[in-house]
Amino acid sequence: MMDTKVDQTIQPKFYVDKKLSKSFDNKLDEDIFNYPFKKESFLKSEKFSFEHTKDSLWKCIKEKAKKKSDMEYFNCVNNLCCKFICTIRKYVKYFLYLKDSSYEIYNINLYNNNNMNIINNKNITNNKNITNNINNSFSNDYINYNHNYNHLNNSSSSKHNNYNVNNIDEKNIKNDYNTYHNIYEQIFFKYNPSFYEYLMFTLMKKLIHYKNYIFNKTKKINNSYNNNDIKNIDGFLIFQNINFEEIFLNTFYSSFPFKLFLHSLYMIFICFIYFVVLYFMLLKKIYTHPFIFHLSVLKFLFDIIFFLSFILYPLFLRLKRIDKIIYSSYISSYIFVCVTFLYSFIIFKCSSYSVKMNSNTYQNNFVFQNMLFLLINIIYICIFCFLKNYMILYSFLYNCRFSIFCILFIFLYYYLFFSLDFYRIIHLPLDNFFFPFLCFLFFSFLFIFKIIMSLYYEYVYEKKYRILFVKKNNLIEKRITKRKNTNINNAYFTKYFSIDNTIPTSPIEDILNNFKHILETINIIEENPNHNLTTNIMKIKEKIKNCDNILRTKNINQVQIGKYRKFEKVYNIWCLDKMYLNYPLNQEETKSFLSNSLNRISFNSFSNMHSLLSSKFQEHYNDIYDWNGNIENIYKANTFISIGYKLLYPLGVLEANFDKEKLKKFLFRICSYYNDIPYHTSLHAAQVAHFSKSMLFMLDMNHKISAIDEFCLHISSLCHDTGHPGLNNYFLINSENNLALTYNDNSVLENYHCSLLFKTLKNPNYNIFEHYPYHIFISCKKNIIKAILSTDMKNHFEYISDFRTSKEFIDYDNLSNDQIWQIFCLILKASDIGHSTLEWNKHLEWTLKINEEFYLQGLLEKSLNIQNSFLCDINTMNKLALSQIDFLKHLCIPLFNELNYICKNNDVYTHCIQPIENNIERWESHKNDNQNLGLHEKYKEENLLSKLELIKFE
C-alpha cells in the first residue's frame, strides 16, 4: 500500500520534471513506470522521501535507457542485415521522391518574392506530379482547336479592343480551356472512333500538353527573376563564381549516384529487349555465320557489365565526391556509344562480303533489313541519351556535349549505310525504296527530337534551381551586417563540411539560432500574411518553446558534445585523450582579459605608438611569412632562435630600453626547455610561431593591432609547449603525477607551460618585459596565459562556439582588446594544428611524429599498468588513416572555417582548407593499407621510465 501511494505521488511529478528538463536526450523506456518501487537497495535504506525516490527512479531510467540506446546504436552500425535493410529503404524513398526530394532546397520561401512564391506553389508541385499530369490531366487541346475554333475567335475578337493579352486572367482561360476540351471529348467518343483515330487523338493531346507545359514553365521562370540573378549564370548554366558551382553541385545533386543507379537499371532492361529484337528477330534470319552470334553475345555482355558497374559503383566504392562519379559516368558514356557504333560497323562490313549480287530480290530485302538494323541501333543510342538527360538532370553542359556527340554518331550511321550499301541501293526501284527510307528518316529524327526536348527540359529545370540558389545566397549576404567584401559561402561550406548543420553548438548559440528563425518567420508573415499563416505561427511557438527549454540548462556556454554521437567519439579521442566518456567535463566561464582598474588611456596610447612604428618593420617581412614556407630552409641555423628573434625584435625594439641581448638569452633559455622527443620540439614551436604570423597577414590584421598585442601572441606561440614531456594530460592525471596534483587535473600541461614561461621571466637575466610599465606587463601576462590555455583541446568546441555567437556583431576594422584576443586564441589553436594544412609529404611527416610520440606513451602506460589511451597503440597505416580522417574533418576544418569568415580575400580557404581536403582524400586512399609503421621494432629496448624525468617540476 505504501509503495502504491508513493508511485501515485511520484509519477505525475516526474513526467512534469522530464518535460521541463532536456538534459537527458536518450530514449526512455516508458514501461518502467508500471513497476512499484520494491528494489531491495531502496527498501533497505528505509528512505521513502519524495526526493530520494525521484533520484532512484531517475538513475534507474538513465541506466536502462542508456543500455537500450547503446544496443540500438550497435545494431544500426554493426549489424549487416540492418545495413542492408536501411539501404533498401533509402533507395525506395529516393525512388518515390525522385523528382522533388532529390533537389530539395531549404527555406525557399525565405528568399523569394511574390513572383517566386507562385513558382514554389505551382511549378515545384507540378514537377512532383509531372508524370501524372502528362498521363491524366491533359486538356484535349487538339480537339478543342477544331471544334471551338469559331467560338474562340469570337470571344477573342470581342475582347481585343478592351484588354491586352497579357492581362487576361489565367484561371478563367484555363477553366474555359478545360470546358471546351471536355465537351469535344464527349462528342468525339459518341461517334465510336476507330482505334487509329483514338491513338492519334491521345498522341496529339500529350504532345500539345507537353509543349505547353515546358514553354509556359520557361516563360514563368524567366519572368520571375530579375536580371541580377541571371547575370551570375552563363549560357551553359555555369556559375561565374567557382565556389558557387562546387557548392551547388555537392549540395543540390547529392542523389546523383542513386539516379545513375536507376538509369542503369532501366538500361539493363532495355539491353535485353535490344538483344532479343536485334539478334533473334533480325540478324539470325540474315546471317548464319557463328561469328555474328558470338559478336552479338559479346556486345550484349558488354552492355550488361557496363550498366551493372554503375549499379555497384556507388554502393561498394562509397565515394563521397560527386564530381568523381559524374566524370567517370560521362567518359564511359562516350565509350559506350563508340562501342555500339563499332559493333554496327563490323556487322555492316561482314554483310558487304556475305551477300550475293545476282539475286535482286534477296538484295532488296537485305537493304531493308540493314536499314532496320541501323534504325534499331539509332533508337538504342537515342533512348540511352534521352534517359540520361531526363532522369539524371545533373549538369546541362555535360549533357549538351554528350547529346551533340550522340547526334553526330547518328549521322555517321547514315554515312555508314549509304557508303557500304550504295552499290545495292542504286539497283533498287525508287518506288520500293522511297517509302521505307522516308519512315526510316521519320523515326530517326523523331528520336533526335526527343533528345533535344529532354535537353531543353533539363535546361529549364536546372536554370530554375540555379537561380534560386543565387537568390538564396545573395539574401544571406545582405543579412550579414557590417561585413564588406566578404564571401559568405567560403565561411560556411567546404567539400566535406557544412558548419550550419554539422558542428556541435552551445545552448546560447541554439538560442540565438532560434531567435534568427523567429525573425525570419516574422518577415515572411509581413511579406505575405495570407500564406501559411497558421504554419508560421506554429513555428514561432515551437522556437519560443525551444528557447524556454534551453534556458533551463545549467551552463548555457558549454557545448553539449554528448548530443552529437559522431562528434562524441572524436572529441573523446582527440580532446579528452579517452575512448569512452559519456559527458564532457564542466568548465568555468572565461573572465575578462583586462582588469576594470586598468588605465586604458595609457594602455591605448602605448599600443598605438607601437602599432604605427611596427608597421614600418613588418612590410619588410611579408614575403618570408608565407603559410607554406619551409622554415628549415629559410632559417638554416637554429630555427627556433632565428624565427623567435625575427618575430620579437622588430616589435620589442620599439620600447626605449629594450635589450636585444636579453631577448637572445630568453630565446635560448626557452629553447633549452624543449625536450628531444618526436613531435613537441622547438621545431614544432617555431612552426606554430611562423603559422601565427602568416595568419595575421592572411586575415589582414597586422596593421589593425598594437605591437604589444602581437608581441604577446608570438611569445605565446613560441612558449605554448615549452617543457612538454611527450605525455598528454590524460596520462599525467591517471598516473597522479605531481603536475596533475598541482594544477588540480585542469589543463595540466598548458598550466605547466605558462608556469615555466613566467618563472623564466622572473629571472632578471631573461626578463624581456623589464622596462615595460607594470600594468602593461600584468595585461600581457593575462593575455599570454589565456592564449596558451586555449591550446587545450578539451575546450576546442567552446572556443569555436564563443566566436560563432559573436562574429556577426564584431566590427573587424575596429576591434576591441577582448575581440583581438578572442581571435588570437583561434589563431594560436589553428597554428598548433597547422601541420594539417601542409602539402601531403610534410603533413605525413608531422603526423608520423605525433603518432610516434603517442606510441611511446602507450608503451609507458603498459609498463605502469595504466589504462591504454586510444591513440597510443597505432602501428599500421590503416588505423592511422582512420584517426586522421576524423581529426581533419571534425576538428581542423571547423576551426579554419571560422578564421575564413574573417578573411576577406579567400586566402584561408586557399592555403588551409583546400590542403586539408586534399589530405583527407590521401588518407582515404590509405584506409585499406596494412603497412606496418615499424614502431615496435624501433622501440623494443627503449628506457620508457626515463620519459618521466623530462618533466622539469620544481
From Swiss-Prot:
Residues 586-930 form the PDEase domain. It catalyses: 3',5'-cyclic GMP + H2O = GMP + H(+). Mg(2+) binds at residue 721. It is found in: Membrane. Not inhibited by cAMP. Inhibited by zaprinast. Its cofactor is Zn(2+); Mg(2+). PROSITE patterns: PDEASE_I_2. Residues 281-296, 349-365, 423-432 are extracellular. The lineage of its organism: Eukaryota, Sar, Alveolata, Apicomplexa, Aconoidasida. Keywords: cGMP, Hydrolase, Magnesium, Membrane, Metal-binding, Transmembrane, Transmembrane helix, Zinc. It comes from Plasmodium falciparum (isolate 3D7). The active site is at residue 680. Residues 1-259, 318-327, 387-401, 454-954 are cytoplasmic. Disruption phenotype: Knockouts at the asexual blood stage are viable and have normal merozoite formation in the host erythrocytes. cGMP hydrolysis is reduced by about 20% with no effect on cAMP hydrolysis. One of its GO terms (molecular function) is 3',5'-cyclic-GMP phosphodiesterase activity. The chain crosses the membrane at residues 260-280, 297-317, 328-348, 366-386, 402-422, 433-453. One of its GO terms (cellular component) is membrane. Pathway: Purine metabolism; 3',5'-cyclic GMP degradation; GMP from 3',5'-cyclic GMP: step 1/1. This is cGMP-specific 3',5'-cyclic phosphodiesterase alpha.
